């Protein structure tokens, strides 16, 4: 197992992506962005409506990755929290990989409300050593409100 670090993130409004840029600058890690083949609406409320309509079992097609998570000792995963859970593109990514032996450091961004999605991440990454997550809470205007561990 390599000691290299891979940063994987999904962003919709840009907040999670901004955090990813900071992490990449500090760690000099490799980076992959999760991008759904069919983009979600830019309007957050339309996206929420679509996600609820699609249902909890929906998994969209996402971009192909150039990096293999198994070739990294550590993977940092960043994602927003959507409608009380992990976004469908993130679930597609998590379910497509073998996490045994990988160390995961997660961070979650959320729009104003703290929702614990850590158990959902744990259930999708069987065999990984998962660190306690960081929760970055923002309001809907992108103002930072709180940091929770």
Predicted regions and their residues:
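N-terminal beta1-alpha1-beta2 submodule of the flavodoxin-like/Rossmannoid cofactor-binding fold
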Residues: 1-77, 84-91, 95, 144
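Conserved beta-strand segments of alpha/beta enzyme cores
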Residues: 28-30, 129-132
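Structural signal for conserved beta-strand scaffold positions within catalytic alpha/beta enzyme cores
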Residues: 33, 106, 132-135
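Short, conserved loop/helix-junction motifs that constitute active-site signature segments
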Residues: 69, 95-102, 124-129
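Short beta-alpha junction loops
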Residues: 108-113
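Glycine-rich phosphate/pyrophosphate-binding loop and the adjoining helix
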Residues: 131-149
């Amino acid at each position: 197992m390599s000691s290299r670090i891979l940063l994987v993130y999904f962003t919709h409004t840009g907040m999670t992506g901004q955090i990813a840029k900071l992490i990449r600058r500090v760690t000099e890690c490799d980076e992959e962005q999760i991008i759904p083949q069919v983009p979600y609406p830019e309007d957050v409320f339309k996206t929420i409506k679509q996600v609820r309509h699609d249902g909890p079992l929906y998994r969209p097609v996402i971009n192909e990755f150039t990096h293999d998570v198994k070739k990294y000792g550590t993977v940092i995963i960043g994602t927003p929290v959507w409608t009380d859970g992990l976004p469908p593109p993130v679930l597609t990514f998590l379910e497509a990989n073998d996490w045994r032996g990988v160390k995961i450091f997660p961070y979650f961004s959320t729009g104003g409300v703290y929702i614990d999605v850590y158990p959902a991440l744990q259930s999708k990454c069987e065999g990984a050593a998962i660190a306690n997550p960081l929760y970055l809470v923002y309001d809907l205007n992108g103002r930072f409100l709180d940091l929770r561990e």
